[in-house]
A protein has these predicted regions:
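Terminal, regulation- and interaction-focused segments at domain boundaries
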Residues: 1-20, 24-39
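Eukaryotic endomembrane contact-site and trafficking scaffolds
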Residues: 54, 97-98
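C-terminal structural segments of small proteins and small subunits
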Residues: 65-97
């Protein structure tokens, strides 16, 4: 599966950035429950692993909350490759909003 890596810089303390990312994941589980069949995440310090399925697609990846940026690494199913730039910009926009 093709991969996608998105970096977004932030000016927050690392713990606050982590809190915001984790809260956004919890919110997404509820807000998008009609589109997401399953969203699982597990955290070890400042690194989170996730698996998601919905709308006929499955994906997985990692989120790293670093002192000055957040990095999302994920796989994209071949069937969704046409939407790679849209997925990337959606992740970037969401992270930018969360970390503002």
């Amino acid at each position: 599966m093709p991969s996608l890596i998105v970096f977004v810089s932030h000016q927050l303390p690392q713990d606050e950035a982590l809190r915001r990312i984790q809260a956004a994941v919890a919110h997404a589980k509820v807000q998008h429950s009609d589109k997401i069949n399953d969203l699982r995440d597990s955290w070890s310090s400042y690194v989170g692993a996730f698996e998601v399925s919905g709308m006929g697609f499955k994906g997985s990846g990692m989120v790293s909350v670093n002192p000055s940026d957040v990095t999302v690494q994920t796989t994209i199913p071949l069937a969704a490759l046409l939407f790679k730039s849209r997925i990337e910009s959606g992740i970037r926009d969401a992270l930018t909003r969360i970390l503002a």
